[in-house]
Every structure is written in C-alpha cells, then in structure tokens.
C-alpha cells in the first residue's frame, strides 16, 4: 500500500508497467505446444515467434531503476545480467507467479538433455534467458561483480552466457536432428562479444555441429553475426536502438537476425545513406508481404499500426547497396523473411531465391512519391557531354559525326518500346565504336558505356512488367541486377532486386 505521508510530501513510488497480455499469450502458447513433438522440419510459427519476441522485449523494458552505486563502470547492462536487478524486475516476478507459478513449476522439471517437445524447448530457453542463469544454474554475472573494473572477467562471463544459450539450442537440434527450431540470443548478451569468435568457437570446437543441415537457422544467425560486427563506424548503413542497446548493419537484415537479437522494425532506426530500404512489417492477403520504403538518410520511423502476432514481420532489405556485393543474397526476398511454412524456410545464403515480388505491396505510397514506371515514365537522364579541350594533340584528327539518338516515347505500345530500345542500343553502340578511337573523348565513352548498361537494366524491367501484366511467366522472372559500373538501380526497378 502507498504510504499516505509519502503521497502528501509528493513522493510517488516508481511503478513498473507490466504487459500481462504478453505473459498470458506466452502461457497459452506453452500449453498449446507442450505435447507437440519436435521433428526434423518442425519450426516455431510466426505467431509464436512474435510472442517470444514480445516476452523478451517486455522483460527488458521492465528493468528496475538502477542504484547509483550498483552500476557497471565498464558500461555492461547489469540490469539484465545479475540477480540483484532481475529479482526486482516486475515483469519477471509476474511471469514466475502467473497462474499459480505453473510456468516456473514446469521449467524446474526440464533439463537440456530430455527436451523433445516444442513447448518444453521454448519454455526452457526463454526462462534461461530472462532468469539470467546459465544451464548449470550459475548467474551470468555474480552480484559481487556488478561494480568490477576487471574487463576481461566481465567480458568472459557475458561471452560464456551468450555462447551457452546458442550452444544449448544447437545441442537440442543435434540430438533431435532438427533444422529450424531457433530463438537466438538477445542483444544485451552481445556486450563486447565478437560474433566471429562465438561462431568459430562453437562450430570449430564441436565435430557434431559440422553438419549444417542441423540447426540451419541457428547457423545462419551465427554466420551473419560472424561477418558483420556490431559497431561498423564508417561502414554502417543502418542503426537500430532499443532501450539504449544499439546495433549497426551494412547488409540487408533478415528476419532471423532482428528476431534473434530482439530488435523490431518499430524501434528507432537511423539511416546513414540516401539509398532506399524496404522495411517489411506484415503479411498480406495475397500470400505476400507488405513493406514501407524509406529513401532519405536520418531517423526513420514506421508509423503504421503494429500488426497482430500472426502477421507481424521484422526484416529490412537494402536497395542500391554496392558496398559488399558478395553478401547480396542476404537481401533475397525468401532469405530475408522466414516463411511461416516450416518446409519452405530458406536458411542457406548460397541457395536462396528471390521470387514472389509480385505478391508484395508497398503501403506508404504518396501521390508525389511514386517510383513505379506506370506513374513516372521519365527515363534516367543522360548527362550533357563535357566540352572537348580546344587544343589539338599529337595525331589529332577530326571528331567523327555521331548518329542522332532517338528520344524514348512512353506512350507507345510495349512492342514499339522494345523496338525503340533496340534501335537506341544499336545507335549508341555505333556511336561508341566511332568515338572510341577519338582520344579526346574518353570521358564521353565512359558516359556512353554507363548509359548502355542503364538501358540494359530498363530492358529487364520492361520484360518483367510485360510478363507480370500478362501473367505469362512459366520461368523465373528476370532479375534486375546492380549497374555493372556503379552498382546503382533505376528507381523503377527497386522492388525487383537485392
């Protein structure tokens, strides 16, 4: 009860907001999946993934106010790592006490070597995470170490906790021979932890884990973090922040990364370039996905209503990202989003496919900001040529006369536009061959080469459009690849690539 004297003196105790709804949903999920056997292709459904995601985020959000004399001088997030703070966390206490402590009672009966069902798996991993204890019952960080200045000690303890959460999930996957069960390891367990070290220590040190067919999503999660550091400095294209925990990315961010770390597309996102990003937020009624697009650098915020658990998606696809083409497959549509059908999940970067875009929808379209070529047929402009230097050089001869390049006409029929494209390409090819021998115009040659490549991209875009509108595409739709010279993508082809 609140003390009336304290209220009179204006002293109001801090009250933690506990999202009981996520606890109720978690309890229902555990009951629903408690007897569901884990088989080779069993996965956690989208609805259940989002329930788990909410539980971990709500636990983080409910951390108690930290004592001034009980903070880490190293900046470690002790509010989620030590029993001193976790036992004060109102969400954690409510979770343990919920439904006459039924969840905690079930958790106490489990150990990592006897779990065979989905509900057991989820309850065990989630309770290990929010309890701040390793599988052997030891705390992530002892209370006496909260104010420790021993950087090596604290970093080693957090790294061990992060690694054993992932190792435990792989151990269960290997024993059951399962491919797709996956929860991950939350962002705060990666404090000063090198993803590459964790990846190699787990996979290089365990012969049984060498079969990448087992625990595919876990492998994909750790492999991604092994090649992409948490803080990329000048190379970062995106930064996510939740409760002060930041993470930067230079690649497309698949759903299993945001889900596994505990981030959401509804968090604070900062863009460091003007290249477009597609932020996938939910499923639609065409077996596809809805996304919002952002083009300008700075803080971006998804303002759409947060979808229900069975529809919500967390994934970001980078467009026009030419910084690391070898990792472009992370942005392939069927790699960046986890399919809700277990058997259709794609977790192999090398074998990922990029089909199905015609089922997706951009949902933040504005009348003055439409990139589709139905509404904006104006082609990419050709730069004006620079003036030729006025002085003659050795072996100078008169500049050859170039053929006139016909202007595109957007109102023509598709067949006429294709013939016109071919005519323009032939004209440009003739001009390129003529001017290529003219030593003064190497810059003009470069511009012609660039424009020919751009026209090739538009030809692919046009072919895709014809196939999609006629619904006649018995083979995979052609992909618009990044420009061979500068890696750019015409605005009309953004939704078809990366």
Swiss-Prot record:
Keyword annotations: Disulfide bond, Membrane, Phosphoprotein, Virion
Compositionally biased residues, Pro residues: 378-390
One matching Pfam family: Pox_A30L_A26L
Compositional bias per record (Basic and acidic residues), positions renumbered to this chain: 355-367
First and last residue of the signal peptide: none
GO cellular component: membrane; virion membrane
Location of the protein in the cell: Virion membrane
Region (Disordered): 352-391
Disulphide bonds in the chain: 43-342
Subunit (UniProt): Interacts with proteins OPG094 and OPG143. Interacts with OPG154. Interacts with OPG152. Interacts with host laminin.
Record family assignment: Belongs to the orthopoxvirus OPG153 protein family.
The protein's role, per its UniProt record: Envelop protein that mediates acid-dependent endocytosis into host cells. Plays an important role in endocytic entry of the virus by acting as an acid-sensitive membrane fusion suppressor. Low pH in host endosomes triggers conformational changes to allow de-repression of viral fusion complex activity and membrane fusion within vesicles. Also plays a role in bridging the mature virion with structural protein OPG152.
Protein name: Envelop protein OPG153
Organism of derivation: Variola virus (isolate Human/India/Ind3/1967) (VARV)
Taxonomic placement: Viruses, Varidnaviria, Bamfordvirae, Nucleocytoviricota, Pokkesviricetes
């Amino acid at each position: 009860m609140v003390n009336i004297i304290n209220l009179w003196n204006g002293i109001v105790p801090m009250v933690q907001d506990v999202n009981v709804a996520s606890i109720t949903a978690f309890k229902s999920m555990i009951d629903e999946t408690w007897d569901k056997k884990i088989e080779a292709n069993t996965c956690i459904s989208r609805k259940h993934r989002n329930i788990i995601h909410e539980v971990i985020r709500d636990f983080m959000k409910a951390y108690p106010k930290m004592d001034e004399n009980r903070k880490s001088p190293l900046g470690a997030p002790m509010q989620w790592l030590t029993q001193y703070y976790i036992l004060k966390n109102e969400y954690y206490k409510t979770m343990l006490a919920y439904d006459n402590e039924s969840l905690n009672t079930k958790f106490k009966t489990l150990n990592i070597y006897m779990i065979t069902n989905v509900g057991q798996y989820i309850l065990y991993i989630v309770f290990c995470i929010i309890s701040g204890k390793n599988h052997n019952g030891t705390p992530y960080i002892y209370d006496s170490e909260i104010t420790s200045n021993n950087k090596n000690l604290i970093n080693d303890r957090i790294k061990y906790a992060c690694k054993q959460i992932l190792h435990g999930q792989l151990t269960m996957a290997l024993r059951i021979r399962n491919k797709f069960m996956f929860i991950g390891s939350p962002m705060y367990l990666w404090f000063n932890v090198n993803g590459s070290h964790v990846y190699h220590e787990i996979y290089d040190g365990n012969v049984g884990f060498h079969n990448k067919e087992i625990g595919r999503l876990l492998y994909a999660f750790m492999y991604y973090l092994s090649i992409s550091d948490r803080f990329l400095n000048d190379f970062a294209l995106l930064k996510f922040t939740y409760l002060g925990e930041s993470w930067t990315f230079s690649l497309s961010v698949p759903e299993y990364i945001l889900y596994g770390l505990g981030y959401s597309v509804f968090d604070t996102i900062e863009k460091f370039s003007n290249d477009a990003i597609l932020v996938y937020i939910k499923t639609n009624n065409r077996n596809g996905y809805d996304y919002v697009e952002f083009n300008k650098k700075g803080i971006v915020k998804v303002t759409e209503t947060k979808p229900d658990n069975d529809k919500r998606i967390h994934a970001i696809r980078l467009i026009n990202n030419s910084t690391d083409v070898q990792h472009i497959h992370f942005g392939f549509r069927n790699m960046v989003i986890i399919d809700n059908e277990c058997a259709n999940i794609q977790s192999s970067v090398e074998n990922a496919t990029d089909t199905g875009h015609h089922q997706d929808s951009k949902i933040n379209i504005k009348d003055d900001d439409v990139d589709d070529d139905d509404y904006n047929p104006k082609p990419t402009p050709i730069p004006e040529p620079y003036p030729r230097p006025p002085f003659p050089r050795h072996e100078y001869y008169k500049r050859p006369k170039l053929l006139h390049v016909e202007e595109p006409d957007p109102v023509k029929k598709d067949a006429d536009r294709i013939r016109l494209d071919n005519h323009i390409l032939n004209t440009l090819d003739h001009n390129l061959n003529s001017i290529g021998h003219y030593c003064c115009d190497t810059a003009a040659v470069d511009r012609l080469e660039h424009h020919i490549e751009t026209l090739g991209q538009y030809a692919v875009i046009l072919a895709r459009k014809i196939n999609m509108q006629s619904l006649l595409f018995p083979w995979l739709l052609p992909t618009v690849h990044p420009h061979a010279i500068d890696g750019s993508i015409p605005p009309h082809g953004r939704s078809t690539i990366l």
